Curated annotation (Swiss-Prot):
Residues that bind L-citrulline: Y85, S90, N121, R125, S176, S185, E261, Y273
Subcellular localization, as worded in the UniProt entry: Cytoplasm
Predominant place of localization: cytoplasm
Catalyses which reaction(s): L-citrulline + L-aspartate + ATP = 2-(N(omega)-L-arginino)succinate + AMP + diphosphate + H(+)
Gene Ontology molecular function, alphabetical: argininosuccinate synthase activity; ATP binding
Identification of the protein by name: Argininosuccinate synthase
CDD domains noted in UniProt: ASS
EC number: 6.3.4.5
Keyword Hydrolase: no
Source species, domain of life: Bacteria
Pathway: Amino-acid biosynthesis; L-arginine biosynthesis; L-arginine from L-ornithine and carbamoyl phosphate: step 2/3
Residues that bind L-aspartate: T117, N121, D122
Catalytic EC class: ligase
C-alpha cells in the first residue's frame, strides 16, 4: 500500500480513523473534505488534519457541482424514496467518491478509505462509486476491521493519541447528524424507538410549523429545461438558489419528515430529515410539468421514478442503468420551462399558479362552457369502445 486518500469530515470518527490508518498501514494518508454546504468550519478541519501530521490536505468547495450535476438531475425526475425521502445523503456520496478517486490518481495513491459504518448504506454508496470510477482501487473500511466498537472507545483512543475531542463530544450525543446543502439528517440513539417523538430543538435548517411565521409568503420559481434558474425573477446559481430556498422554507417549517426507511443492507432505520428548499423545489417542478408534459410522458416518468430513486438510494449513480434512465428523464424536460407561484405557510407548500410558453393547457378545452374544439357527443363512442372488455367480463 503506497498511499491512502481518506474521506475526512474532521469529526471524531474520521479523526480517529486518520490516526488508525497512520498507525496500522505505515504509509502516508491524504485527507479530502468536500464542502457540500454542511456549514462546517473548513479552517478548523484543516487545523485538525495538520495536527495529525498530514502533508496533503484537499478541502474543496463542491457546492455548485453538487447542486448542478447531482441534485438538479435528480429533481428532474421528482425523485422520492419510499414516499417521503428526498435522498439528501444518498445523492452526496457519488460526488465525494468520484472526487476521492480523482485525488488518488493525482497524488499517486492506490487506496481510498471512508468512515461509514458496517450497518449503513453509505459504505455501499462509497464503495460502489469507487469501483465504478476505478475498478482496481483498494478500499479500507475501518469500521468493518477495527476493534473500536463504541463511541466511548473512540473517545479513549482519541485521548490516548492526543486527538482533540471537543467538550460536547465527550458524552454520548443524542443523534448522528449528516448535513449538506440539500438536507440535514438525524439518526440513531434516542430516535431508535420509532414511537418516541424527537426533540425538535435539534433542527438546524428549519423551525417546526408551530413556531413558523404567522404570515404566508408568496414566491415565484422560474424553470428552464426542468431546472430552477431564478427566484422572484432574480437569476441565481444552482447552489445559491437552493441555499435561498432553504432559508425561505426553513422559516415556514417546510420539509421536516419523520420516517422509517428500508436500508439496502436489510435494516429498517428511523430518521428525522430537514429538506426545506428541496421540498419547495419538488412541488414547484411537479407544477410546471403539469402544464408542459404530455399525459403519457408524465405517466411514464411517474412509473420509472421509483426505480430511479432506488438506484440512487442503493448507490448505483454511476451505473449504465441510471444513466439510461437519466437520458430519458432529461429528454422529457426540453420544454419544461416557465414560472410557478407558491404560497408557503406553516409547513405547507401550496401551488397557486403556473405559466409557460410551452403550456399544453387549453382554457377553451378545459372550460365547462361549450367549445368549438370539443364535441360532447364524441365521448359516447369513446366510452363504448373502451368499455367493451368491461361489458364482457
Amino acid at each position: 500500500m503506497k498511499k491512502i486518500v481518506l474521506a475526512y469530515s474532521g469529526g471524531l470518527d474520521t479523526s480517529v480513523i486518520l490516526k488508525w490508518l497512520q498507525e496500522n498501514y505505515n504509509c502516508e494518508v491524504v485527507v479530502f473534505t468536500a464542502d457540500l454546504g454542511q456549514d462546517d468550519d473548513m479552517s478548523v478541519i484543516r487545523q485538525k488534519a495538520t495536527a495529525l501530521n498530514v502533508k496533503e490536505i484537499f478541502i474543496e468547495d463542491l457546492k455548485e457541482e453538487f447542486v448542478k450535476d447531482f441534485v438538479f438531475p435528480m429533481f428532474r425526475a421528482n425523485t422520492v424514496y419510499e414516499g417521503y425521502y428526498l435522498l439528501g445523503t444518498s445523492i452526496a456520496r457519488p460526488l465525494i467518491a468520484k472526487r476521492q478517486i480523482e485525488i488518488a490518481k493525482l497524488t499517486g495513491a492506490d487506496t481510498v478509505a471512508h468512515g461509514a459504518t458496517g450497518k449503513g448504506n453509505d459504505q455501499i454508496r462509497f464503495e460502489f462509486g469507487y469501483y465504478c470510477c476505478n475498478p482496481n482501487i483498494k478500499v479500507i473500511a475501518p469500521w468493518r476491521q477495527w476493534k473500536l466498537t463504541s463511541r466511548n472507545s473512540l473517545i479513549e483512543y482519541a485521548k490516548k493519541h492526543g486527538i482533540n475531542v471537543p467538550l460536547d463530544k465527550s458524552s454520548e450525543p443524542p443523534y448522528s447528524i449528516d448535513a449538506n446543502l440539500l438536507h440535514t439528517s438525524y439518526e440513531g440513539k434516542s430516535l431508535e424507538d420509532p414511537y418516541v417523538e424527537p426533540d425538535y430543538t435539534i433542527l438546524s435548517k428549519s423551525v417546526t410549523p408551530e413556531l413558523a411565521s404567522d404570515t404566508p409568503e408568496y414566491i415565484e420559481i422560474s424553470f428552464e429545461k426542468g431546472d430552477p434558474c431564478a427566484i422572484n425573477n432574480i437569476p441565481l446559481s444552482p447552489a445559491n438558489l437552493l441555499k435561498q430556498l432553504n432559508t425561505i422554507g426553513g422559516k415556514h417549517g417546510i420539509g421536516i419528515i419523520d420516517i422509517v426507511e428500508n436500508r439496502y443492507v436489510g435494516i429498517k432505520s428511523r430518521g428525522i430529515y430537514e429538506t426545506p428548499g428541496g421540498t419547495i423545489l419538488l412541488h414547484a417542478h411537479r407544477a410546471i410539468e403539469s402544464i408542459t408534459l404530455d399525459r403519457e410522458a408524465a405517466h411514464l416518468k411517474d412509473e420509472i421514478m421509483p426505480k430511479y430513486a432506488k438506484l440512487i438510494y442503493n448507490g448505483y449513480w454511476w451505473t449504465t442503468e441510471r444513466k439510461m434512465l437519466q437520458a430519458l428523464i432529461d429528454r422529457s424536460q426540453e420544454k419544461v420551462n416557465g414560472v410557478v407561484r407558491l404560497k408557503l405557510y406553516k409547513g405547507s407548500v401550496i401551488v397557486v399558479g403556473r405559466k409557460s410558453e410551452n403550456s399544453l393547457y387549453s382554457h377553451n378545452l378545459a372550460s365547462f362552457d361549450l367549445s368549438e374544439d370539443y364535441n360532447h357527443t364524441d365521448a359516447e363512442g369513446f366510452i363504448k369502445i373502451n368499455s367493451l372488455r368491461l361489458r364482457n367480463c
